[in-house]
Amino acid sequence: MNDAVNPTAAKTVTGWPVSEAAAGAILTIDLGAIRENYRRLKALLGGVHCAGVVKANGYGLGAAKVAAALTREGCDIFFVALLAEGIALRKAVGTGPDIYVLNGLPPGSEPEAVAAGLCAVINSGAQLKAWRAAVHDAGRRLPAAIQVDSGMSRLGMAPAEVEALAGDSSAFDGIDIKYVMSHLACADEPRHPANEQQRLAFERLRAMLPRAPASLANSSGIFLGPSYHHDLARPGAALYGINPTPGEPNPMLPVVWLQAKVAQTRRIEKGAGIGYGHSYHADGPLSLATISFGYADGWLRRSASAAWFEGVRLPFLGRVSMDSIILDISALPPGRLREGDLVELLGPSQSVDDAAGHAGTIGYEILASLGPRFHRHYVGG
């Protein structure tokens, strides 16, 4: 099967062509909502530049499609996590936007980054030395961001490294420092003392480095106020509809609608065991539906415990299987739900954040875990 033969086919991240008819589930992605979320964030930032974080294949939604939509809103800076993501994104968006590799470049991969026109994020003295060698080999200045560890203890130059560089006037020769940046650990908790501690540490560390624009705010950091905005904000989760202000109404539009197909319906009697391990036994006659969707599609076994059909909640019964989930559809009129019908897993009845709450995780994990077997349907954009 190929797209020329089947115009409804949609390539997944694995390259599989999955038509709507062939897929077990449909993932609808609203690019128009992503664009509106970007506009809302830009409005909060005033004149501050706003990038787009499209790592992990655009949080599982398709980095190339998301970046193209954001480009139409004027976004010209993107962040990915890995060099491979950056190379793929460069092929998708062309030569225009700047693309930064957040995790830094693996040793020896610098020529690939230079060839793809990527901007290194320098997280250590060793990476700085390697990027300077790349400058020498390229025979020209190369762009980079310098990331400092302001208190998250994850990525970035340690304070001692920054202090050592402060007295070395030649340390950054040949490097076009686009930004000095850091990352907030607790921005989704506005009253957490670490936010202000990190902001002050960031100001102290960047003052030791060559003068350059600064970037600190992630999605939630934007909502901490102008003192966190600096010259560039780097929203990711908020673009995709995840609430950047937990505990408050979500200021972002929802972006995804996930529906799974009913593979089979049946009636069972009291006492019948359901699913692997017979972890549930019917306490009376039940109507069941099995959907073609499971943990191989990224739905964690601990994730939200119900689907929805026409506003009616359909609880999961038994364990989530690799390719299927069993629903209790007894609340529906007999025959109302049939094979091939679609039930909602994410959408108006159950947001990404709702599903994450049921699973004891965060919306980022729900989206980034979504697998490649869906038919992906893009609207808007």
From Swiss-Prot:
It catalyses: L-alanine = D-alanine. Its cofactor is pyridoxal 5'-phosphate. Pfam families: Ala_racemase_C, Ala_racemase_N. The active site is at K55 (proton acceptor), Y276 (proton acceptor). InterPro entries: Ala_racemase (IPR000821), Ala_racemase/Decarboxylase_C (IPR009006), Ala_racemase_C (IPR011079), Ala_racemase_N (IPR001608), Ala_racemase_pyridoxalP-BS (IPR020622), PLP-binding_barrel (IPR029066). It comes from the Bacteria. Substrate binds at R154, M322. The modification N6-(pyridoxal phosphate)lysine is found at K55. Its EC number is 5.1.1.1. One of its GO terms (cellular component) is cytosol. GO terms for biological process: D-alanine biosynthetic process. GO terms for molecular function: alanine racemase activity; pyridoxal phosphate binding. Keywords: Isomerase, Pyridoxal phosphate. Gene3D superfamilies: Alanine racemase (3.20.20.10), Lyase, Ornithine Decarboxylase, Chain A, domain 1 (2.40.37.10). It is an enzyme of class 5 (isomerase). Isomerizes L-alanine to D-alanine which is then oxidized to pyruvate by DadA. Belongs to the alanine racemase family. This is Alanine racemase, catabolic. The lineage of its organism: Bacteria, Pseudomonadati, Pseudomonadota, Alphaproteobacteria, Hyphomicrobiales.
